[in-house]
């Protein structure tokens, strides 16, 4: 660092190649937030170490970016065992799972992300492996086929899912330690932002950290990403420190508002508000209109909007709340949405025209009326 750059970000900081990995805490005591989950895990880990046994199987449930993978890695470190990682969609056939399980040593941790996307046939093989530490495989085909039992080391399966409802009951019941992770508070995220800035050797003020934290959607991963983008702006502006003004300017340029809503969130809310007069509207129609997969909407967009009280899920579909109308700066219609069908665009799917094109055309016509 040059002497005349001591108080500047410009040229003084090089961010790591993999910032997410470098910022992850290594022990439970360094992990911020999720106090109940952390306290319980500490007890379970200590008990397993005292008994010299493998920890019971663990299932983490919660939206993306809350620390499921990080906690799994910390567990392996605290237990003093090896950590193996994979994801549900990657395990395509029985041989893939057998290779993973037979290479595990005593008390090792195997982490399977997105376990709700595991092939049902593979899931059947996993049952005896979790319960009896045995692998039941069929060798050969036809009349020559035979069943082979392979003994496995006593391991710990740690799985993560964003969709608990998609797990079958037999699989869900085999996890002795289910843990739900919740969105973080602004205070917790502010602490995380300050810690990450310190690791980056980037000076940041209290109000700057608070500004980033309150727009991070309750998610540490998003807080880390926003901090890196704010660092970019501060670098170019040659700011001495990241304060509220720098953070606000950067995040406004990124179209992240003061509650953390991004353009996709606002498009979601505007679609229901403007096209469907506040709802109710079905999730499939929303997915088609936004050109986004249904899973992405249910896993990424809706959890935060539900937590913030912007939308409600009803048997007839999604509706937006008074809070959402106010946030969008719009007035809620006085007539019920159900009786306002005449002003809703014709979204019949019998036409060859995609639903999303019809909705975009409707919004364009309203803009230029």
From Swiss-Prot:
Residues that, per the record, bind Mg(2+): 69
GO biological process, one term: DNA repair
Region (Head domain (RuvB-H)): 258-369
Function in brief: The RuvA-RuvB-RuvC complex processes Holliday junction (HJ) DNA during genetic recombination and DNA repair, while the RuvA-RuvB complex plays an important role in the rescue of blocked DNA replication forks via replication fork reversal (RFR). RuvA specifically binds to HJ cruciform DNA, conferring on it an open structure. The RuvB hexamer acts as an ATP-dependent pump, pulling dsDNA into and through the RuvAB complex. RuvB forms 2 homohexamers on either side of HJ DNA bound by 1 or 2 RuvA tetramers; 4 subunits per hexamer contact DNA at a time.
UniProt-annotated binding residues for ATP: 23-24, 65, 68-70, 131-133, 174, 184, 221
Record region (Small ATPAse domain (RuvB-S)): 185-255
Catalytic activity: ATP + H2O = ADP + phosphate + H(+)
Pfam families: AAA_lid_4, RuvB_C, RuvB_N
The protein, known as: Holliday junction branch migration complex subunit RuvB
Comment field on protein domains: Has 3 domains, the large (RuvB-L) and small ATPase (RuvB-S) domains and the C-terminal head (RuvB-H) domain. The head domain binds DNA, while the ATPase domains jointly bind ATP, ADP or are empty depending on the state of the subunit in the translocation cycle. During a single DNA translocation step the structure of each domain remains the same, but their relative positions change.
NCBIfam families: PRK00080.1, ruvB
SMART domains found in the cross-reference section: AAA
Subcellular location: Cytoplasm
Region (Large ATPase domain (RuvB-L)): 1-184
Gene3D superfamilies according to UniProt: 1.10.8.60, P-loop containing nucleotide triphosphate hydrolases (3.40.50.300), Winged helix-like DNA-binding domain superfamily/Winged helix DNA-binding domain (1.10.10.10)
InterPro entries, alphabetized: AAA+_ATPase (IPR003593), AAA_lid_4 (IPR041445), DNA_helicase_Holl-junc_RuvB (IPR004605), P-loop_NTPase (IPR027417), RuvB-like_N (IPR008824), RuvB_C (IPR008823), WH-like_DNA-bd_sf (IPR036388), WH_DNA-bd_sf (IPR036390)
Native species: Bartonella bacilliformis (strain ATCC 35685 / KC583 / Herrer 020/F12,63)
Complex formation: Homohexamer. Forms an RuvA(8)-RuvB(12)-Holliday junction (HJ) complex. HJ DNA is sandwiched between 2 RuvA tetramers; dsDNA enters through RuvA and exits via RuvB. An RuvB hexamer assembles on each DNA strand where it exits the tetramer. Each RuvB hexamer is contacted by two RuvA subunits (via domain III) on 2 adjacent RuvB subunits; this complex drives branch migration. In the full resolvosome a probable DNA-RuvA(4)-RuvB(12)-RuvC(2) complex forms which resolves the HJ.
Family: Belongs to the RuvB family.
Chain positions recorded as DNA binding sites: 294, 313, 318
Single GO cellular component term: Holliday junction resolvase complex
Keywords: ATP-binding, Cytoplasm, DNA damage, DNA recombination, DNA repair, DNA-binding, Hydrolase, Nucleotide-binding
PANTHER family: HOLLIDAY JUNCTION BRANCH MIGRATION COMPLEX SUBUNIT RUVB, PTHR42848
GO molecular function, one term: ATP hydrolysis activity
Enzyme Commission number(s) from the entry: 3.6.4.-
């Amino acid at each position: 660092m040059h002497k005349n750059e001591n108080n500047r970000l410009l040229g003084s900081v090089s961010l790591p190649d993999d910032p997410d990995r470098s910022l992850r805490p290594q022990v439970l005591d360094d992990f911020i937030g999720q106090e109940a989950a952390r306290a319980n895990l500490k007890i379970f880990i200590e008990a397993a170490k005292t008994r010299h046994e493998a920890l019971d199987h663990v299932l983490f449930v919660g939206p993306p970016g809350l620390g499921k993978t990080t906690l799994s890695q910390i567990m392996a470190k605290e237990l003093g065992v090896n950590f193996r990682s994979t994801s549900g969609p990657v395990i395509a056939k029985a041989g893939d799972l057998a290779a993973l399980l037979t290479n595990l040593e005593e008390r090792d941790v195997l982490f399977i992300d997105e376990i709700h996307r595991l092939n049902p046939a593979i899931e059947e093989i996993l049952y005896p492996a979790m319960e009896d530490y045995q692998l039941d495989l069929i060798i050969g085909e036809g009349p020559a086929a035979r069943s082979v039992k392979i003994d496995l080391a006593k391991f710990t399966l740690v799985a993560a899912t964003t969709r608990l409802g998609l797990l079958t009951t037999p699989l869900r019941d085999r996890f002795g330690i289910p843990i739900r992770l919740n969105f973080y508070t602004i205070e917790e995220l502010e602490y995380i932002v300050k810690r990450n800035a310190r690791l980056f050797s980037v000076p940041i003020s209290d109000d700057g950290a608070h500004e980033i934290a309150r727009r991070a959607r309750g998610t540490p991963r998003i807080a880390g990403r926003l901090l890196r983008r704010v660092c970019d702006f501060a670098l170019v502006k040659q700011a001495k420190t990241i304060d509220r003004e720098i953070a606000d300017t950067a995040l406004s340029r990124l179209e992240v508002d003061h509650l953390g809503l991004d353009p996709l969130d606002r498009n979601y809310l505007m679609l229901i508000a403007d096209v469907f007069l506040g709802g109710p509207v079905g999730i499939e129609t929303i997915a088609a209109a936004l050109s986004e997969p249904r899973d992405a909407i249910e896993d990424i967009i809706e959890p935060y909007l539900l937590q913030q009280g912007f939308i409600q899920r009803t048997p007839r579909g999604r509706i937006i709340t008074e809070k959402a109308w106010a946030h969008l700066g719009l007035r809620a219609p006085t007539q019920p949405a159900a009786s306002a069908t005449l002003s809703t665009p014709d979204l019949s799917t019998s036409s060859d025209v995609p639903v999303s094109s019809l909705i975009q055309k409707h919004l364009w016509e309203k803009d230029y009326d």
